[in-house]
Curated annotation (Swiss-Prot):
Broad class of enzyme this protein falls into: transferase
The protein's name in its UniProt record: Chitin synthase I
Taxonomic placement: Eukaryota, Fungi, Dikarya, Ascomycota, Pezizomycotina
Gene: ChsI
One CC-aspect GO term: chitosome
EC number: 2.4.1.16
Protein's GO biological process: ascospore wall assembly; chitin biosynthetic process; septum digestion after cytokinesis
Spans traversing the lipid bilayer: 431-451, 530-550, 560-580, 606-626, 641-661, 687-707, 716-736, 815-835, 861-881
Known role: Polymerizes chitin, a structural polymer of the cell wall and septum, by transferring the sugar moiety of UDP-GlcNAc to the non-reducing end of the growing chitin polymer. Contributes to the production of conidia and the ability of fungal conidia to germinate. Not involved in fungal stress tolerances.
A Pfam family hit: Chitin_synth_1N
Disruption phenotype: Leads to delayed conidial germination.
């Protein structure tokens, strides 16, 4: 089959100047053979042109002759040299044009059908006289295998496949072949970086007037089920409908969908969820039985399906259903042959498809993230209003379920509070400076031109894609491997520091995206391991390479703002490094203070010793589990630790409140006139109050000012109780597993073998489904997701049984090591009379005033540091609001 793969709107390998430029001439056409412009359009005596009522815009479709059974003379056989085509003239006349034979007239006696014949015949959609083979046994679908002739252009296999008639009849379409009647399949046999140079192209460049892509949206997925995928696609479709319903917009309006391409990239043919693949089939984007394993002995690296669908999705009661006759959407589905991680999926998006389409704005969404109904528009608007905006992100929300039912789970509530405060204080502060440390890959956008490398191949994308070669490579160091676990942070840094440029990053509060959050301890531990390690090492990289800001073209004041922000980030990183030590010191000081005579006395001393011992035991347990056990195999232990640290936090909150109240009572009963000013002279009181008000008070005030205070009511308590878990469980596991640089999704690619295509002199044969098979296959795919999913329990495999046995061995090993460590610690404490035993055993009981003074000084420094950092965040958030009032987005 002839290839559609011309370069970026070119024909025959040469670029056709765009309309509206000085180079463009409506009556000229670039001919690759002659290397010069040809004269005005002249009609062929044999070629009949179609007239369509649906649209005046004609797509250069793969000609019908490319899939007949008869021998083909090849794409260049006996063509007249004086035949030329004027695409613009055909576009204006609303006539159908065969864009794959441009510059070459139909032969007088062709061995294949001419372009005047309808593609979809009465019986079969591929040829007049298909060859039938033996029918499949009863019980399966009664398929007829049809052998079809295909032509290749420069070694590339491209097929225009009719969509199932049962789908076609439910949606509006032209009477002739167009983007709604045919799905286009391309078998890519190259690396993403070679896609353009190998003469592959996409449909948007094959229209009589190539379509400009303003928005290029990518949805990356691994093995997400039909519910997660539908949730994302429903949000994307709503955004496209919103932009099509903006008649007064200069950019958008009725035909806005023609400026938007939605790309779905699935990471591995063996990994894609069959129900998700069935949804794509139901939309007409995917067809089973079309893909090939090899083309001329070259392995296929990606299967690319293109279709403009009228079929949208809806989700009710956990079941996905199709909704036909809706706003058209240009879909591009890339099914990678192998599982090569998300960063490789982005290579296909940016290096392969992005180079062909040359979009303005690229939007990145993870499957499972549901963008708000107009969120993508608001992201685009940020770029439209600020020419130097190189990247933007919206607010990531935790999915709370109907009526917030998911908040019953304290883990979900804690993450909800964490996300909210990050979007209220952290992101606005960074946006005010112009540099956001990370644009979440789950929902963010970039200006395509800002990401491009320079002429030497150096730039943001070069650094970003370096992570693909580092992972699993023997030359990669531990620092670089961990750093590229958060490769989106590297991309943000390289974008803002791009040489001789002055791009900035922005936070768009109006754009929201909802995503599922881990609802079990083990899932949370595994997720945060990659987040914490990646962000920590990426932050070190950014601080160490701060000088690269000076190679950019930012103004002096912008660079000064970046310097202030990096000082702030450095202080935060230092506190994060010492978080586990700081928490223990605060715990020790508060529990020891409760043992004083004017507070709890002897009871406080005993409680302090008991909690100190338990603290040590559970912290050691965290270390032992983190260094040897899989979280999935130690779920109960991790859950027990969450409960213990919550109890510790309750005790600390009681201690802080009790000490502050006692200080007030002591001042009231001192015999002097009580006043507020006198109260603040009490160092214990004002240190605690300043710290608490600077943290909790600022959280509340900022949330109210942002008109988003509800998380303070629904999630604040849960967040406070689980704060020690973040410090003593998640941080410990992350640092104990810095050697683990995996993403947790890499697996064996054992997948069904596909047929291959071999050609001679540009032609070959392949098996393709006929029309009856298309309908039966389409019905079968629809049935896959038309009912609620019922999990089929399968007996454990040998590998699973072995893994379970290994979990048991690890559990025994953990118990032995824990007993050994605890008994040795108890022996040392008894011999040395330390760990608080000296306070509850008979003795002098002399206090160490010097140690007490040091503790008070330490507490003062820590609490005032918290106050200053919180106040700085608050000021940044307020400045963001002021700027947002004038900017409008």
């Amino acid at each position: 089959m002839q290839n559609h793969g011309f370069n970026d709107g070119s024909y025959g390998g040469r670029r056709l100047p765009a309309a509206g430029t000085d180079e463009y001439h409506a009556d000229q056409y670039y001919d690759d053979r002659a290397g010069h412009n040809l004269g005005p359009y002249s009609n062929s005596s044999q070629g009949q042109l179609y007239t369509a009522d649906y649209s005046s815009e004609r797509l250069y479709m793969q000609p019908p002759q490319s899939i007949t059974q008869s021998p083909s003379p090849g794409p260049y056989y006996n063509h007249q040299q004086d035949h030329v085509v004027n695409p613009q003239q055909i576009h204006d006349r609303g006539e159908y044009f065969d864009g794959y034979n441009q510059g070459h007239p139909p032969q007088e006696h062709q061995a294949y059908d001419d372009d005047g014949q309808p593609l979809i015949e009465d019986q079969h959609g591929y040829s007049d006289n298909p060859q039938h083979q033996t029918q499949t046994p009863a019980g399966g679908i009664k398929r007829w295998k049809t052998v079809k002739q295909v032509l290749l252009y420069r070694g590339n296999l491209v097929l225009d496949c009719p969509v199932p008639p049962i789908l076609l009849n439910q949606n509006p379409h032209s009477k002739e072949r167009d983007e709604f009647t045919h799905m286009r399949y391309s078998a890519a046999t190259c690396d993403p970086s070679d896609f353009y140079n190998e003469n592959f192209t996409l449909r948007q460049k094959l229209f009589s007037s190539p379509r400009h892509t303003e928005l290029f949206i990518v949805v990356t997925m691994y093995n997400e089920d039909d519910i997660l995928f539908a949730r994302t696609m429903i949000g994307v479709f709503k955004n496209i409908e919103y932009m099509c319903n903006r008649p007064n917009s200069k950019t958008w309006g009725k035909d806005a969908w023609k400026k938007i391409v939605v790309c779905v990239v699935s990471d591995g043919r063996a990994k894609i969820n069959p129900r998700t693949k069935a949804i794509l089939s139901g939309m007409g984007v995917y067809q089973e039985g079309i893909a090939k394993q090899q083309v001329n002995n070259k392995d296929v690296t990606a299967h690319i399906y293109e279709y403009s669908t009228h079929t949208h999705l809806q989700l009710k009661n956990g079941v996905v259903s199709l909704v036909h006759n809706r706003q058209p959407v240009q879909m591009l589905f890339c099914l990678k042959e192998k599982n090569q991680k998300k960063i490789n999926s982005h290579r296909w998006f940016f290096q392969a498809f992005g180079r062909v389409l040359d979009p303005n704005i690229c939007v990145l969404i993870d499957a499972g993230t549901r963008p708000g109904g107009n969120s993508i528009y608001h992201l685009w608007k940020a770029f439209d209003l600020e020419p130097m905006c190189g990247g933007a992100c919206g607010e990531i929300k935790a999915m709370l379920g109907t009526g917030g039912k998911n908040l019953i789970n304290p883990l979900v509530a804690t993450q909800n509070f964490e996300y909210k405060m990050s979007n209220i204080l952290d992101k606005p502060l960074e946006s005010a400076f112009g540099f956001i440390s990370v644009l979440p890959g789950a929902f963010s956008a970039y200006r395509y031109v800002a990401l491009q490398n320079d002429k030497n191949g150096k730039g943001p994308l070069e650094k970003y894609f370096l992570g693909e070669t580092l992972h699993g490579g023997s030359s990669a160091g531990l620092f670089e491997s961990n750093m590229y676990l958060a490769e989106d942070r590297i991309l943000c840094f390289e974008l803002v520091t791009k040489r001789n440029c002055h791009w900035i990053l922005q936070y768009v509060k109006s754009a929201t995206g909802e995503t599922d959050v881990p609802d079990t301890v083990t899932e949370l531990v595994l997720q945060r391991r990659r987040w914490l390690n990646g962000s920590f090492f990426a932050a070190i990289y950014a601080i160490a390479h701060f000088y690269e800001f000076f190679r950019s073209d930012h103004s002096f004041f912008r660079k000064l703002a970046f310097f202030v922000e990096f000082v702030f980030n450095t202080i935060n990183m230092i506190f994060a490094w010492f978080a586990i030590g700081n928490f223990f010191l605060v715990f020790k000081i508060l529990t020891t203070s409760l043992g004083s005579a004017d507070l709890l006395g002897r009871t406080g001393e005993i409680l302090g010793v008991v909690f100190t011992w338990l603290y040590g035991v559970f912290l050691m347990t965290c270390f032992v589990l983190s260094m040897g056990n899989r979280p999935a195999g130690s779920g109960r232990l991790y859950t027990a630790m969450v409960w213990f640290w919550a109890i510790i936090m309750i005790y600390l909150m009681f201690a802080a409140i009790f000490i502050a109240v006692k200080a007030i009572i002591k001042d009231v009963n001192s015999g002097t006139a009580f006043s507020i000013s006198q109260l603040f002279k009490n160092p214990v009181f004002y240190t605690l109050i300043i710290s608490v008000m600077s943290t909790f008070g600022i959280w509340l005030i900022a949330s109210i000012i942002m008109f988003d205070p509800w998380h303070m009511l629904t999630s604040f308590i849960q967040y406070m109780l689980l704060t020690p878990t973040y410090t003593n469980v998640l941080n410990v596991y992350a640092f104990c597993n810095t050697h683990d640089v995996s993403w947790g999704t890499k697996g064996d690619d054992k997948v069904e073998k596909l047929p291959s295509v071999n050609t001679k002199d540009g032609q070959g044969k392949t098996d393709l489904p006929d029309e009856g098979d298309l309908n039966a296959q389409y019905q079968r795919e629809i049935e896959k997701f038309s009912t609620k999913f019922k999990e089929v329990k399968t007996p454990p495999t040998a590998a699973q049984l072995q893994e379970k046995q290994m979990d048991y061995y690890r559990g025994v090993r953990t118990g032995v090591v824990l007993i050994w460590m605890i008994t040795n610690f108890a022996l040392a404490a008894l011999v040395l009379s330390s760990a608080g035993l000296e306070r509850i055993t008979p003795g002098n009981g002399n206090s160490q005033q010097e140690a007490t003074d040091r503790s008070n000084i330490y507490m003062t420094i820590v609490l005032w540091s918290v106050a200053v950092l919180s106040g700085f965040k608050f000021l940044g958030a307020m400045w963001f609001l002021v700027v947002r009032m004038f900017r409008g987005v």
